[in-house]
């Protein structure tokens, strides 16, 4: 019991340090965050403009709401992942990665604390980006009337994203400069978010993976919450429990794979040199 209390206390100290670290980062480099949101905002607007020019009068046939929600979620996944693997890449260059690896805490604990510390900022970024599209695109059927369910789904979804981030961080430990490769994967997630579930055949492996992947489960829930055409929210306790369990299992799998890759990196001496 004492050991558990000590572990929780130590983890809270790490979390406090990471929150302070993130605050200092925001205070010193505010333009980096602002410019990231701005350029992410501009990119999708350019996509819509391109569609409107190529198919005059047919842009309304697009499911703009689903595209925008999926795109904002992709930004949420991207910023979360970069907070883990991107920082490992930077620390391997500055020499601070070795200090983390020989501290009294495991790298996995430090990364988890870092992810939790940055999560409020990333949720705010999601809201800001979605709100910008809401006010700049006419007749957009997106509503913020159910913020409790929005936040609940994003928090549960974040657990699954942490699993993805652990895997990306482990690959970064082994190969270091892999940022461009991960950006391609993040845009592949965008394809998943934009996928029409009705076009997948029930009972197939692809459909089963789509229905149980935490990121696509979160996307499906957010569509029901945010898009006005869904008048009633029909979330059963069983559905939310399945969503939570799947996210936890994915996070545990990601943590396990990260530990394997961290041990391999230690064996190869990759934590002490770039």
Name each model feature, range by range.
Residues 1-274:
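Hydrophobic transmembrane alpha-helices and immediately adjacent juxtamembrane helices
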């Amino acid at each position: 019991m004492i050991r558990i209390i000590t572990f929780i206390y130590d983890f809270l100290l790490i979390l406090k340090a990471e929150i302070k670290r993130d605050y200092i980062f925001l205070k010193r480099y505010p333009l980096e965050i602002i410019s990231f949101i701005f350029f992410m905002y501009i990119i999708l607007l350019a996509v819509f403009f391109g569609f409107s020019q190529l198919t005059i009068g047919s842009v309304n046939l697009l499911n703009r709401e689903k595209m925008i929600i999926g795109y904002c979620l992709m930004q949420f996944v991207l910023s979360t992942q970069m907070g883990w693997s991107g920082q490992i890449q930077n620390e391997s260059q500055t020499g601070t990665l070795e200090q983390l690896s020989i501290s009294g805490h495991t790298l996995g604990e430090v990364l988890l604390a870092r992810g939790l510390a940055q999560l409020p900022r990333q949720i705010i970024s999601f809201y800001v980006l979605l709100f910008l599209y809401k006010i700049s695109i006419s007749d957009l059927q997106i509503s913020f009337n159910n913020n409790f369910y929005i936040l609940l789904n994003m928090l549960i979804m974040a657990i699954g994203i942490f699993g993805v981030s652990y895997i990306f961080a482990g690959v970064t430990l082994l190969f270091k400069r892999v940022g461009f490769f991960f950006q391609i994967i993040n845009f592949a997630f965008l394809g998943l978010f934009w996928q029409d579930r009705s076009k997948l055949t029930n009972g197939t492996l692809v459909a089963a993976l789509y229905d149980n992947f935490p990121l696509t489960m979160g996307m499906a829930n957010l569509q029901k919450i945010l898009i006005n055409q869904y008048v009633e929210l029909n979330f059963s306790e069983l559905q939310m429990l399945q969503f939570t369990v799947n996210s936890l299992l994915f996070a545990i799998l990601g943590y396990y794979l990260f530990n394997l890759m961290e041990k391999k990196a230690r064996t190869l001496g990759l934590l002490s040199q770039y």
